[in-house]
Amino acid sequence: MERAISTTPILDQALTCVQSYKALAATVQELASPELQRSIEEGLAQFLTHMPEFNILVNAVEPPHTSWDYLLRNDASQRGEMTMLLMELQCEIDQMAFAIRQAMQQQHPEAEPLSNNSRLVDAWTENLRSVEDHTVWRLAFWRRDHAVHTTYPTTNPLVNQSFYFAIRNELGLDVSTQFRECIRRAITQECPTITARPALHRRLVDLVVQRRRFWNFQRRIRGLSKDAVLWGRDALAPPHFAPGDERFTCPFCFFDLPVAAYRTPRAWTDHVMSDLEGYVCLYETCSSTRSWPETCPHACTSFGAWFTAMAGSFAEGVEWCSHAFACDGRRLEEVHRPRCAAPAVRLDSVCPLCGREPAVEETELRMADAADPLQDDDQNRAKARLLLSHIAGHLEVITPMAFTWNTDRNALDPDRRLFWGDIGSPGGAGGSA
């Protein structure tokens, strides 16, 4: 049986903290003294200004479950620490709300209680600064570091030494090398001309192999047997939902998700690609390197972010930068010169992966976001959209290979076909977990 790693305490604590804040804000509205009410409202406004992450939680459309679970699910030490910090923050808010209620219940309000209450507000604000130092700023740094990352890089680096963090066959032998070679050949089959771009080819292979390692690890720590993690799944077909189901556990990211949001193939593909960070930097000369496990750092969780990075670079000459160099090989000081001194990189009309010129009638044109209407495209942006939409189609075939492959000996046999579902017999290259 699958053994879930629960972050319910931290999610409940975050929600309780938000509810306490809102209760305090509501209590302030009931104060008889306009001066005291204004003083506390200013304190609350300052609180949110200096605590941007809490501001996001308070004003979020959805509960703070998804993003916090996304960051902290794999790290027990961070979960415990964050729970304590949230409890501290909630305690401060609750104490302030209690003090205000006590002041409201006084039978004979006079100037002195008002003065005392004002000093209480000042003391509370000062206390919050210490909480702020330990809590929300730390959250801000975490979210900044992981803003475009999936759960994969948040795993403790010691997992690299785990027996579970390997790609094995039914005999328990590490077949990472064979798996990597199969992926390399499959990518070449999907994109024949990518061999002319060895760095980009290697970047894609690294991403697929890395993600399969993490997926195997995640499945093993949830109780799947060593034989069960041999099998891949069809990653791009939405799961089957039983009538009446409102939520389900994603078999890839293991989040608890609402059924309604993922019924369409497009929404499901977007979710899978988000968890895989499947939209990668296309610059052959990309010099970005980071220590394990972020072997493919220039990757995005959404087509919109990727389109902005890549199309903006080509159309406006503001290159996707990495360390001391831009991804096109120029030094950063060259990139940051006035626009006229930095010639724009122009987008080729031929796909760098397959060598074909994409046709509008064969390509699903994508929007970066709801505020990105196709009809507003000028010539350069329309050209970028067509090519990047075409390339995105390739990436949506390549990166899910991390989920779709079997790793038994038959599946890794170079004489057999390699894509999920191509082999109908048992033990083929595709299967269901």
UniProtKB/Swiss-Prot annotation:
Documented EC number(s): 1.-.-.-
This protein's pathway: Secondary metabolite biosynthesis
Molecular function (Gene Ontology), one example: oxidoreductase activity
UniProtKB keywords: Oxidoreductase
UniProt superkingdom: Eukaryota
Biological role stated in the UniProt entry: Oxidoreductase; part of the gene cluster that mediates the biosynthesis of aculins. The pathway begins with the synthesis of 6-methylsalicylic acid by the polyketide synthase (PKS) acuA via condensation of acetate and malonate units. The 6-methylsalicylic acid decarboxylase acuB then catalyzes the decarboxylation of 6-methylsalicylic acid to yield m-cresol (also known as 3-methylphenol). These first reactions occur in the cytosol.
UniProt name for this protein: Oxidoreductase acuF
Species this protein is from: Aspergillus aculeatus (strain ATCC 16872 / CBS 172.66 / WB 5094)
Lineage of the organism: Eukaryota, Fungi, Dikarya, Ascomycota, Pezizomycotina
Gene: acuF
